[in-house]
């Protein structure tokens, strides 16, 4: 007996590699990020496909090409950052591309966020096609009010990134997504939860029989 444990490789369901965002690109690509994950004992990662105007297949092809330098196992979620009738009809095709999850945002107005009605419809479509909805939960409208106020006051140091994104907004949005999930009878996964209040919202929703995870 060696006193050591044999453990399976970890699965990280939320990474951002080769990601263009706000005029820059994330520090790791699909090789360096995978290498770092492997050193930490993670052998599978799940990244997010950025939805381009040309549709799902075009977008997935871009990210599959970038992942050709992969060092470990990987898969993708789809960022649903646009929504219209064409996109609604195409969502089921993602299953044939190996993507079974849709991520929506309640923040980043005018960039990543879609409106609540579109989120609700996407949840219904996901439900009907055996897919899982995921949500980045914050209050985008409040954030978009606080950021200009902070900039006008000269508050540009790092702590104001947090101060312009109040934690209660994440709590409120988590409850909102749980309510939509109950109404749609669809499962939802709340990503990167930070607030105790979000856990409270999940507990409340689960007690009501909602399939909500975080």
Describe each model-derived feature in a short phrase.
Residues 7, 57-73, 77, 120-135:
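Alpha-helix-loop-beta-strand connector modules within alpha/beta enzyme cores
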Residues 17-20, 47-49, 74-76, 106-108, ...:
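A short, structure-level motif marking secondary-structure boundaries and short turns
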């Amino acid at each position: 007996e060696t006193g050591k444990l044999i453990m399976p490789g970890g699965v990280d369901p939320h990474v951002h590699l080769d990601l263009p965002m706000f005029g820059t690109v994330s520090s790791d690509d699909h090789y360096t990020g995978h290498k770092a994950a492997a050193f930490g004992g993670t052998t599978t990662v799940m990244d997010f496909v950025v939805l381009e105007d040309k549709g799902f297949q075009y977008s997935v092809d871009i990210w599959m090409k970038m992942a050709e330098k992969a060092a470990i196992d990987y898969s993708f979620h789809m960022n649903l950052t646009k929504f219209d009738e064409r996109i609604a009809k195409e969502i089921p095709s993602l299953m044939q591309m190996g993507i079974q999850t849709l991520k929506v945002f309640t923040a980043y107005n005018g960039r990543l966020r879609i409106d609540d009605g579109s989120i609700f419809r996407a949840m219904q479509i996901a439900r009907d096609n055996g897919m899982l909805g995921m949500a980045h939960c914050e209050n985008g409208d409040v954030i978009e009010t606080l950021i200009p106020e902070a900039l006008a006051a000269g508050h540009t140091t790092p702590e104001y990134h947090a101060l312009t994104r109040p934690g209660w907004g994440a709590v409120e949005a988590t409850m909102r997504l749980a309510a939509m999930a109950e109404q749609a009878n669809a499962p939802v996964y709340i990503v990167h939860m930070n607030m105790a209040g979000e856990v409270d919202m999940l507990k409340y929703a689960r007690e009501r029989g909602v399939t909500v995870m975080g």
